[in-house]
């Protein structure tokens, strides 16, 4: 007996896209690619494509659906571009292209590309089919093939490519005998409207197929049940009481019943049924074959119109009696009740009604037999006498309708009780006998009557005890699993109601329980295996996992002991549509083999692989030392059966069977490795980035009003910069005057003391303070005095040169220009001969960044003001070498050294200013964003353009290029 919910089959919504494509393929070679990821990676390839290309399924997964990995030097570039355009435009198209197998053998393919849409009419997949047309692209006349060899090659090519031949030659004459080709090719030729969609949907049936659990079929089954009981009652009555259907009304009713049963036969040829695995079978061919092998013959015999023959007037009595007896065959209609009993017992009240009807039907049949026995024994045809001990004779005397012999007429006994009285009396006797009551007013007297009475008592006691005495016990024994199933369902329903589980999740839970029960029939496999001994348990496990061991080449070299050890560790998992086998981020501790159904692998909300029968997913535990984290979700599309083995159990077996471990590691190829994350870019993301880039490119520049605070702030920066430049120009004019007038510097400095006091306001964290140039101007006089006295005491080794060292870089540059006049007196050749070598130790005085000063400019251990003090006499100037050298170096070299030193110092200052300005610009942009958000109500006409302040780096020294 099947479970209560099992007669409906597995009817949850499923994504049967892969099954539909495989069913329609008919040996077509195809791949499926994701249309939402860049390069359209392959998510599924059937065995035909793998055989045709020479690649394993795991090798082509995540490769481009355009099959660029099969391109070669002879592949046409224009065709490749057309293929790419077809993918980019989501079009349907076909091409002839030369590609290469894995062994680099060139093959001509006829490629068809078709987009697959989901329920939102969005293209999510590409279906690409491949047909080998090499035989039609190569010339028949080949020098290497002569005679019969050439003919054999052509014949072999034609016989192996019948489907391709029909596709390439659609104009076939009507009278020609053509072979049936792939239905998938027909689908692709008709258009994308009839292509299967990639979505979850309830199981669909063909238009002329009726679901066995629909309302119409359920109502029809109850009508058939009622008519079956009608037949079971009238057929025995008509046969026993020998009634001819002379009444037209009864004849019409019986004929209508026969027609209804004939219609039921026709409906059975178009009604789905539940397969052995719990699936709903809707294939018309399978339905017809199943019905022909089971109940068709019995139903046909029970529907023959036997009453039509008896309705004729001039029918021989023997023939009429024969056909009346054949009416008993109609009792075979009770088989309809037997095979659909599980449909009716779903309803509690129907069970009690059926049991009472069965008891009454048994009493009716016994009453008909009881009357037949009395009617057979009451008359003696040989002696034309009546037996006084028959129960019919006693009944006739009791009710006052005795039998009388008509000697002048028919010569037969006439009279006696009516048929209604006889039937009621017979039913009364059988009911009292079946219930063991027996009042004795009707009693058997002949031997046959007594034997039948004994049989009635035995049958009655059995029926009474079975149906009425032990109904509860019998039901508990017969439907123990069903009761447990209902108990489990009630517990689950109460749990879901108690914890207020969402409706969608509740439906998934209930569907999973129903489907799991349908597969296991409520049998606890682990409990059964525990009863069996170890050897028998291992044999059972090998049988349960035989599909995995036979389909995968990794187990071919395993010994019997190894297979038994592996089989003991395998577990069978049943998954309902929508179940997640792995969540992204959780540990991958199992290796899963797909036995039936299909699954999808989802990474970043995109389908990166579709797994079907024969695929393997998980992790390569035998090659990795650490436990992996799943990089994707694995979700069931249909009802799936997975054979799973844990990581620790597999490693334990592989460690023990070392020889098998090498073969297993080499031959087992994962269809999808959950440890590895696929790096891809979505086409939608690429398009969105391109749109944003174009939007930024076409945006109008930001315009601010003239009185905006940011514009006033930048105006203040410009004023400060102009003041600083004016001060620097004043300093340069003062230094030029020093060079020209020599000792008159002191008077000129005093006269222009106010100009030297000019301040430069710099941007810094603290309030601005003036930076005076007075120190630089006062030190200029002493430097020039020393330049005009080269042989003085300052050239000695103890001369520290403190005053020149305190000058700024620009002032020291002017000093070098003044010294150049004296250096010109030294000949170039003499200077080159006696130029002392500088020590490397004293020449590597680099600047290091230290704490920030008030102006925000980084300072160094060697301040620009004190750079001269930190250098040796040889580094400061060649003229400060040892006293024994009475000559000076070439003025061009000294000038270049001084310029480079000044350039380095200025560059450091400019870098510091740039860093500070960058920080200020970031803060100003944040201020601007806040102000713009608050002042968004301003009109666009009141704004003006904001220009970035000129970077200090743009005002480089004219010597920066050197």
Swiss-Prot record:
Assign the protein's first listed, main location to one coarse class.
Answer: membrane
Asked if the record carries the keyword Coiled coil, the reply is no
Give me the Extracellular side stretches, as residue ranges: 242-248, 310-318, 373-421, 444-450
The modified positions for Phosphoserine read 947, 951, 954
**GO MF annotations in UniProt:** 14-3-3 protein binding; calmodulin binding; delayed rectifier potassium channel activity; identical protein binding; phosphatidylinositol bisphosphate binding; protein kinase binding; protein-containing complex binding; transmembrane transporter binding
The membrane topology noted for this protein in its Swiss-Prot or TrEMBL record is: Multi-pass membrane protein
Q: Which Gene3D superfamilies match?
A: 1.10.1200.260, 1.10.287.70, Jelly Rolls, PAS domain
List this protein's GO terms for biological process: cellular response to calcium ion; monoatomic ion transmembrane transport; potassium ion transmembrane transport; potassium ion transport; regulation of cell population proliferation; regulation of membrane potential; regulation of presynaptic cytosolic calcium ion concentration; regulation of synaptic vesicle exocytosis
Q: Which residues form the PAC domain?
A: 93-145
Signal sequence segment: none
The record places the motif (Selectivity filter) at: 436-441
What InterPro entries does this protein map onto?
A: cNMP-bd_dom, cNMP-bd_dom_sf, Ion_trans_dom, K_chnl_volt-dep_EAG, K_chnl_volt-dep_EAG/ELK/ERG, KCNH_animal-type, PAC, PAS
Query: What sections of the protein cross the membrane?
Result: 221-241, 249-269, 291-309, 319-341, 351-372, 451-471
Tissue-specific expression: Detected in cerebellum, at parallel fiber synapses on Purkinje cell spines. Detected in hippocampus neurons (at protein level). Detected in brain, but not in the other tissues tested; expression is highest in granular cells of the dentate gyrus, in hippocampus CA3 pyramidal cells, and in cerebellar granule cells. Detected in pituitary.
Q: Using the UniProt annotation, give all residue ranges assigned to the region (CAD (involved in subunit assembly)).
A: 897-937
Q: Where is this region: Calmodulin-binding?
A: 646-743
**What residue stretches are annotated with the PAS domain?**
14-94
Top-level division of the source organism's lineage: Eukaryota
On whether Acetylation is a keyword of this UniProt record, the answer is: no
Regarding protein family, the annotation reads: Belongs to the potassium channel family. H (Eag) (TC 1.A.1.20) subfamily. Kv10.1/KCNH1 sub-subfamily.
Name-wise, this protein is Voltage-gated delayed rectifier potassium channel KCNH1
* Gene assigned in the entry: Kcnh1
